[in-house]
Amino acid sequence: MKTEISLPLAIFFSDNGNGSWVVSNATWPSDPSYFAHSFSDGPVWNEHVANALHLELVNIATGGATTNNGFVQGRTGPESEIPVPSTAEQIASFLSWDVPRPGDVFVHWSGVNEILFNPNVTGSQTTSWINENIETLYRAGARNIVLGNYNDIETFPGTYNASGYQSDNVKSYMDDLSIGLRNIVGAYSAYANTALVEAQTLFRNIAANPEEYGIDEKYNATYSSIPTIQ
């Protein structure tokens, strides 16, 4: 069904949001301190962005999602046992009931859960699936596209000092993914408005200077259900 909204949309395909609450039949996350059933204690980045840009938020993201479930299956739940829609499926869902408009902004922020669920994948492999998703959006009419990268996997509070996350492949994954994302942004910049949110640089600054950001214990996790790499 076509959405009747006067404002341009901000559409988010990602691995966060409150979709886990839906796919878990309203059982996860169960901690009442999580705001609006998302993995946060308050409004999250996409809500702030939509408000700042005066865009109508359409958040299709689901915690635990990967870029393509045929490549790496995304999961959520207390034991990461519940399969979730990938960003490819999130895009297909949106395009089944709406079409891009000239002022709509599409944010595709994905790629971290692949290495969390499978330590043998590479950043370039994940990038190829992200590129397919962006091509789908572009061919459907999307002309404002934003991508984002992440902090280094081995510095996540839930993975810090975990033996399964110390391999050379894991440590190089985010740099390789970021190179691929920059290439995608550059390639499509000739045909659309594109941008990359450099979260990796920000998080590296936070890790190096946590006190400047008001962080006392940078490696303490608030959400501890991280899949174990065997």
What are these regions (language model features)?
Residues P29-S128:
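Conserved SGNH/GDSL esterase-like catalytic core that processes O-acyl groups on lipids
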Residues N18, N25, N120, S124-Q125, ...:
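N-linked glycosylation sites
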Residues H48-L55, T136-N144, D176-V197:
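A structural motif corresponding to the C-terminal end of an alpha-helix
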